[in-house]
Amino acid sequence: AYNATPGATDAALFLGMINSFSHNTKVTAGIELAVQRNYPKGSILNPDNEYTSNANPWAQTVTLNNIGFGAVSRAMFCFGYLEEAFCIDGNWGAWQGQGTAKDGTAYGFTNFEWLGGSARGAWCFKDGEPLAWAAWSQMATIGDAEEFESTVPPMFYLGRKLLPGYFGSGKYRGGPGESAVHWCVEPGKHIGITRPNGGLSSTASVALGMNGAYPGPSSFMISARGTNLDEVNKKGLAPRDARELLEMTDSGELKVDDLQVWKMDCPELSMKNNDLFVDAAGSSGGWGDPLDRDPNAVIEDLNSGVSYFTNTSRGT
């Protein structure tokens, strides 16, 4: 549910304020004194129905808060506090669902690794960092793949890595987002997967590129059902991220009966043996005009694999 009580909304706002422009790890009375809030009665942040579910206020408040935090970051820049000025993004992701094991045991699950940490947007003087920041947590961590595998019995990681080119370009680029490929193995009687997401389910990701830079790309996921993964695995060529999966599909190396790229919350997807589910999130925006980027930084990104080479030409 995307409703929230005023108290829960305050909690989401205050946590984000700490990470965005405050030098502390705890909420203090200073925030209460410094910030004015207005939650109109009957709005989703102050429902007039006392029985309204309000279990997930972060989903929509992240996007709303980022607008405010971005404005504060611009103000820091204008006042000359350059070390405090960066592009504030909250492009989180997660996936959830339910299943029934072979013996009839029912279970539910959530994989929230891309909620634990996302990329920090570009600073006004340097590139952003991957996985190092989250507006809603003072200790960003995406957790261990093995732990998430233990909570979703049929789904195993084929890859979990930063996605090349998955950031907002600028004089200083944003930190790259991340992608994981999940392999369905002997799912029992049933497993269904859906996807809640801050950039898909409630609102679009806020375009937060600063001073002429591009914003970070929004989250997305891919479902590949009915594959020849057994043959691909024998060659040791299983896809490790979203880009590799699409490239292998285009080349015919990976055969897929039903391939879907989801840029919105997907309906429940029933997964079978050797089906693949790919998610990508956590990208961030850049700072400054991309044409002003140091050519040596462009070369370094290409050599390190943070960016990828695209051979294009444009006529006039």
Predicted stretch roles:
Residues A1-T316:
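Glycine/proline-enriched, intrinsically flexible loops and inter-domain linkers
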